[in-house]
Amino acid sequence: MTQEEKIERFHEIVNEMANLYAKKNANYGDSFSKLYNDLGPMAGLVPLHNKLDRLTNLIKGNHNDFESVEDTIRDLACYSVMFLIELENSSNDKGENN
């Protein structure tokens, strides 16, 4: 795969993740933001920690029928972006610049 093809694929993956994020928020509400607002920045670490544990188990060969390495990596990426958005919102609410 060329560098140009990798960049194109990167954009495709990010767009797929954004669409899934929008659909889940439409169906379930913005539970991550609610949790973050209730518990603060430490709440953002919980789903990342859980997904890293799952990824570790999957890579070690503890597979199951409904989770994949690829899906777990996408989940980690989505939660990371969601965490970043909440951090930015918190900083903006406090008048801070990051």
Locate the predicted segments by residue.
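Intrinsically disordered, low-complexity regulatory regions
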Residues: 1-98
